[in-house]
Design a protein with these regions (language model features):
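Short helix-loop capping/hinge segments that flank enzyme active sites or metal/cofactor-binding pockets
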Residues: 1-43, 47, 63-64, 103-106, ...
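Short, basic, helix/turn surface patches
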Residues: 1-13, 85-88, 125-138
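Tryptophan-centric aromatic hotspots in well-structured domains and transmembrane helices
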Residues: 19, 43, 72, 87-88
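Structural helix-boundary/capping segments
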Residues: 26-27, 32-33, 44, 52, ...
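Short, surface-exposed loop/helix-turn segments at secondary-structure junctions
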Residues: 34, 66-87
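Structured helix-beta-strand junction loops
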Residues: 38, 52-53
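Short, solvent-exposed amphipathic alpha-helical segments in soluble enzyme
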Residues: 41, 73-75, 134-135
């Protein structure tokens, strides 16, 4: 399926993504089983979290927007990023929970670039998540125009 697409279009894919795909091809069944066990533990922890809280609110990204000429962040607060995707790990890591998540703009950096939050709710609570997001959007009332 996608392996065929990768083989036929490899020269058109960004080199970092090619490396990710090639690493994926080398993952063993045992490693996948271990990863699924870790993910199961994550589900249990998230479930416990939502016994006490209705929502998890966190930044959409670990860093402020950066120059368009910079392909990716190499360091955050003095800590080196091991891969080109570490700087937005908080964005994709939450998707591993299978919980509904929404991102909202909430303001602008000191240089005028947009910043946001993501809100996560327990599984199958999309209606509550959307209602809560609407309340936040109304309270924050970020200027609807683009800063660029």
């Amino acid at each position: 399926m996608l392996g065929d697409l990768y083989k036929s279009k490899k020269d058109e894919i960004l080199v970092d993504i090619v490396r990710n795909i090639e690493v994926g091809f080398k993952v063993s069944n045992e490693e996948i089983i271990t990863a699924e066990k870790i993910r199961q533990d994550l589900f249990i922890k998230v479930d416990k979290f939502f016994e006490e809280y209705d929502f998890l609110i966190c930044p959409t990204c670990s860093v402020l927007p950066f120059d368009i000429e910079t392909p990716f962040v190499k360091e955050i607060d003095g800590v080196a990023c091991k891969t080109y995707i570490d700087w937005f790990a908080i964005t994709f890591a939450l998707t591993l929970t299978s919980c509904p998540i929404i991102s909202l703009p909430v303001g602008f950096s000191s240089t005028g670039l947009p910043v946001g939050i993501q809100i996560m709710s327990k599984p199958r609570q999309e209606d509550k998540l959307l209602a809560f997001a609407k309340v936040i959007e109304e309270k924050v009332s970020v200027n609807k125009s683009s800063p660029i």
